[in-house]
Regions:
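C-terminal output helix
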Residues: 53, 71-80
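Metal-dependent catalytic cores of enzymes that make or break cyclic nucleotides
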Residues: 120-296
Length: 304
């Protein structure tokens, strides 16, 4: 056990006897399973016990092979060599698959980023807003999982929410330039037109016939349609209330409002972090899920 602890990442294979003075072979295997070492370190058990129950238990505990005594040294050598070679090939395959997944995810993020930048460019903004939303969304999600386990926020889900957050305003593609880029406050009628961007964005994603049921697209749809909903039901377009609003949309809504407050706009100057948080907590930008406030109430300014 002490050798496993000391050389864990450097061990190529363990030859394990069943009968040992302090801890038997099954005990060692159980210990390795508890620490997930058995996934990375192949074990060959060598034993004089040849009953089916012993062999089955050994394989159930994760051994790669079981050699019965007495044994031939050359046969043991070949089986050790074959096991090490097999595990090495598996590791190379896992690395290859991981690289392919990484490249696919990187390309997905790149295409989404390009599309979102097009929207921001048309909206007359620098494109930094999308990057800010990504960063703030990720920070809020990280704090949210520390605060509660109420939501399904696995690493994969959080990653998709962060990626999809870049598309939150994609519906603005369908808004008239004169309204979208008006250098002043909007009239009530113009604001009603702007509000349609959430439905337009969701409809665009719904029209993706072959991809609309993909998890990333579903999350992006929820964010597009409902990132202007508010926890008290006074948002738009559907007046959803409380937990009727998907957590993805709740988090992006808060990130969107916070970034809008701390950023310069044609109709206003940027507020400080402290002032922005104060305005959000006072409900000046609508009501949000109290749990999601956690990150913004930290004393340190968010670096975006």
């Amino acid at each position: 056990i002490s050798l496993l602890r000391q050389y864990e990442t450097e061990i190529s294979l363990v030859l394990l006897d069943l009968v040992m003075p302090v801890m038997d072979g099954f005990g060692v295997l159980s210990y390795m399973n508890e620490r997930n070492w058995i996934e990375d370190i192949p074990v060959i058990m060598i034993s004089g016990e040849d009953s089916v129950s012993y062999v089955r238990r050994a394989f159930d505990l994760g051994v790669a092979d079981y050699i019965k005594k007495p044994f031939d040294a050359q046969i043991v050598y070949r089986r050790v060599y074959n096991t090490i070679t097999l595990y090495a090939k598996q590791r190379r395959l896992l690395l290859l698959v991981a690289d392919q997944i990484y490249e696919k995810e990187k390309n997905n993020r790149m295409m989404i980023s390009i599309l979102s930048q097009i929207v921001e460019f048309r909206n007359g903004e620098s494109g930094a807003h999308v990057l800010h939303i990504n960063i703030i969304t990720e920070l809020i999600l990280e704090r949210l999982i520390q605060k509660t386990d109420k939501y399904d926020l696995s690493g994969a889900v959080r990653g998709m929410i962060v990626t999809a957050s870049a598309l939150h305003d994609i519906g603005k593609i369908g808004i008239d330039d004169k309204i979208l880029n008006k250098p002043g406050r909007l009239t009530n009628e113009e604001f009603e037109v702007i509000k349609t961007h959430s439905v337009i964005g969701a409809s665009m994603l719904e029209s993706l016939e072959y991809y609309k049921d993909e998890p990333l697209v579903r999350i992006a749809h929820d964010i597009c349609r409902w990132h202007h909903e508010r926890y008290d039901g006074k948002g738009y377009p559907d007046g959803l209330k409380g937990e009727e609003i998907p957590i993805s949309a709740q988090v992006v809504a808060l990130a969107d409002v916070y970034d809008a407050l701390i950023s310069d706009r044609v109709y206003k100057k940027a507020y400080s972090h402290e002032k922005a948080v104060e305005m959000i907590l006072n409900g000046e930008c609508g009501t949000f899920n109290p749990v999601s406030y956690t990150h913004l109430t930290l004393p340190t300014k968010l670096e975006v």
